[in-house]
Amino acid sequence: MPLTHKVTAMRVTDTAGNVPVASGAVSSLSDRRSDVESMMGRSTPATLSTPGTRTSTTATRTTTTRITSCAPALSADESAACHAEPSFDDLVAAYFDCRRTKRNTASALAFEQDLEHNLIALHDELVAGAYRPGRSICFVITRPKPREVWAAAFRDRIVHHLLYNQVAPAIEASLIADSCACIPGRGTLYAARRLEAKIRSASENWTRPLWYLKGDLANFFVAIDKRILHRLLADRIRETRWLQLAELILFHDPRENYEVRGDARHLAQVPPHKRLVNQAPHFGLPIGNLSSQFFANIYLDVLDQYVKHELRVRHYIRYVDDFVLLHESPQQL
């Protein structure tokens, strides 16, 4: 299992229901020269289904565990769901996805000052292969504990959503059902209900003793090896255009061009080994980007497949870098 992380905070302890989320894609401009006001004024239409994919509902009852094999995602041409190059409609859909949660940031407001021009310029850069990520913002959040966060510029976040919209549906369909977080329909409620169902199943509805092992991966995001992740991405993304964009995002080093926002004194509260600025160039993903969350699930699918297929653990669930295994025998755990 080619992961460089070590497991921490493991402990074995005795102990005596899913709504699919639709894609955020919306209808966009078919004419690049359409008026910005008409684009901004339209309401969000119904979700567009992606050709070659299907929406599924995962039952919360987990008396049986679905085990999936790791298979490469279909390319854009093979699935007929993507274009050989980014279309302007795809870019506008990604813009609306990004705007949903970032519309009031300074970077978003600046981008929307000349929205049509900026979208066209960004599209031209992507088609020509001239796109390069810009400056990032570094700041610290203090709850629940001090953590260094890196925020990409709004235009770069649009590109993250563009890549995600094109390649994520097929890849996420190959992930096990027990991989939670950063996947549509698999948030905290999904994870909690699935874990409860597993406990009920393994304990025969609380009638048998049950043990659990809880662990997490130390310093997960800053310890991700980009070289390993790159190989995993190359196995999953077969369409050259999208793989090149994924590589550009992956190997972009935000430490080369960033500014610190907020109280700089808070940086001292973050342990040095948990800071991205203190890692080797080929280690670490910036916490705060959609691309990092998506890449992390691909990275840890190796762990999921190992636990399911090699260890053959029936009752297992993972939420980002935290995972739980259930068994009736503490020795087995």
What would you call each of these model-derived segments?
Residues F111, I183-P184, G288, S292:
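Conserved, non-catalytic sequence blocks in retroelement Pol enzymes and Pol-derived host proteins
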Residues P146-I176, Q279-K308:
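Conserved pre-motif C helix in the palm subdomain of viral-like polymerases
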Residues R135:
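Extended, charge-enriched "interface" segments that sit outside catalytic cores
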Residues N118, L126, K198, A202-V320, ...:
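Conserved polymerase palm-domain catalytic core
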Residues M1-I120:
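Non-catalytic, polymerase-adjacent accessory regions of viral genome-replication enzymes
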Residues E78-A81, Y164-D225:
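Active-site-proximal segment of RNA-dependent polymerases
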Residues F96-L109, F139-W150, S174-D178:
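Glycine-/proline-rich flexible loop or hinge segments
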